[in-house]
């Protein structure tokens, strides 16, 4: 009887230690994400929109939009902490994607459940909170849709990866737009702007150590090369590159355990 009681005490102590360690890890990770969100506040000046800390006065539904986008991003990142095997780095946020969703290469329509026919569900992105659209209804009644987002998410899911095993981000984390065309436009970030985003990219990669990093296109490849990290370059799916992207990402995924 005494031996049994001692064994139970040892087991209970071991469980308590593991639980405490897991709670500490979760707290540290959460602190890391919150610190990362604060870093994102420091966006460069000029024709750059910061969706997590700025209001798009012409196109946001209301002034709560930045806070909603921060919640979206926080939930998305927390879902993937400790389980990511693949990091995919794009160029910059687009006005049809992260500008309103708050998540790179992810459209409002994905979050609102309007891409289920493409095999993409809102819970693939996050499930801890309910998604909320931040754009007003005038421009796109069903929310904005981004072709790159649909192609990237759809391809990775069809290749059999669990959504928490991959995380999407951008070399330039904010939305660079054409000042003559307004917020609802995209442009390539300048070299000076890309340099301003380097710290955020480095912090992001430290948050999500993984087996493979994929660069979508030349801008992402250039930034990753500057950080001296190993990566696989694949064709960006935009501008007619979808077919080649699917072929190349399939090869990368086949090599991933």
Where are the language model's segments positioned?
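Short, flexible loop segments at boundaries between secondary-structure elements
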Residues: 229-255
């Amino acid at each position: 009887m005494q031996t049994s009681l001692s064994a139970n005490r040892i087991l209970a102590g071991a469980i308590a230690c593991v639980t405490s360690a897991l709670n500490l890890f979760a707290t540290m990770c959460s602190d890391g994400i919150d610190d990362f969100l604060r870093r994102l506040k420091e966006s460069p000046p000029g024709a750059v929109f910061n969706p997590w800390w700025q209001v798009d006065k012409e196109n946001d539904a209301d002034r709560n939009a930045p806070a909603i986008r921060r919640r979206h991003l926080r939930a998305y990142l927390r879902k993937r902490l400790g389980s990511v095997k693949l990091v995919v780095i794009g160029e910059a946020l687009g006005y049809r994607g992260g500008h309103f969703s708050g998540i790179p290469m992810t459209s409002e329509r994905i979050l609102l459940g309007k891409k289920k026919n493409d095999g993409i569900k809102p819970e693939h992105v996050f499930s801890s909170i309910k998604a909320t659209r931040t754009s007003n209804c005038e421009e796109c009644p069903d929310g904005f849709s981004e072709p790159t987002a649909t192609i990237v998410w759809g391809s990775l899911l069809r290749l059999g990866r669990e959504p928490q095993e991959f995380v999407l981000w951008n070399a330039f984390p904010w939305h660079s737009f054409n000042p003559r065309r307004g917020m609802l436009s995209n442009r390539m970030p300048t070299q000076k702007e890309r340099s301003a985003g380097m710290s955020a990219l480095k912090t992001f990669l430290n948050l999500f150590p993984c087996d493979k990093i994929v660069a979508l296109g030349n801008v992402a490849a250039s930034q990753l090369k500057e950080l001296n990290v190993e990566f696989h370059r694949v064709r960006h799916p935009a501008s007619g590159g979808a077919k080649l992207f699917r072929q190349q990402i399939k090869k990368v995924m086949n090599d991933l355990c």
